[in-house]
A protein has these predicted regions:
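Beta-strand signatures of extracellular beta-sandwich domains
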Residues: 78-82, 145-147
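Short, solvent-exposed loop/turn segments enriched in Ser/Thr/Gly
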Residues: 54-61
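Asparagine-centered strand-capping/turn motif at beta-strand->loop junctions
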Residues: 62-68
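Short structured motifs
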Residues: 42-48, 98-102, 127-131
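Short, hydrophobic/aromatic beta-strand segments
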Residues: 70-78, 90-92
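Terminal connector regions
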Residues: 120-165
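Intrinsically disordered, low-complexity Pro/Gly/Ser/Thr-rich segments with frequent PxxP/GP/PP motifs
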Residues: 85-126
């Protein structure tokens, strides 16, 4: 059976469309300028109703700012929290199970606050920091260090950040 010119053109068109769909993310890449994305620790507050002798709940507010010319989002922020220079633990703020259209939108030239509950468990080595947080968390020098996955329509980049409050 010989393939005629019309069938050959049809097969070629189908292959071209399939290759365009498969290779589109590789061909069109939205470059994210990570220097135009900032992540700041803007608030750490003790939730008083949850304070116990075993565990403290701290509400962190991270402010993400996007100075790029297109909308971005984040799927995951991993961080380590420090109180007066001492590490009190690590945590993850994740939107990975949320569809892309439900994740926090970082619009161009705009900032968005993200709140996350950080659980700090009592330990003998951190007893002094634990009691200081329970008595007055505003007198503590808070700092944070971590990484965030920043996404555009076709690109995923990792942004390293650190900040002090």
């Amino acid at each position: 059976m010989i393939i005629g010119p019309r069938r050959l053109a049809l097969i070629g068109a189908i292959v071209a469309v399939a290759l365009a769909i498969i290779f589109y993310p590789l061909i069109v890449r939205t470059p994210i300028d990570l220097d135009k994305v900032s992540i700041e620790l803007t608030k750490v507050a003790l939730k008083p109703s949850t304070a116990s002798e075993e565990e403290l709940s701290l509400e962190l507010t991270l402010t993400l700012t996007n100075l790029n010319n297109f909308t971005l989002t984040t799927s995951r922020i991993e961080y380590e929290l420090f109180a007066d220079g001492a590490s009190i633990g690590t945590s993850v703020l994740s939107y990975e199970s949320v569809p892309v259209n439900g994740r926090p939108a970082l619009f161009p030239g705009d900032s968005i606050p993200l709140r996350h509950l950080f659980l700090y468990k009592y330990s003998d080595s951190g007893a002094e920091t634990f009691s200081k947080i329970m008595s007055n968390s505003t007198q503590i020098d808070w700092s944070i260090r971590g990484s965030a996955f920043i996404e555009s329509a076709t690109t995923l980049e990792t942004k390293q950040f650190s900040d002090e409050l």
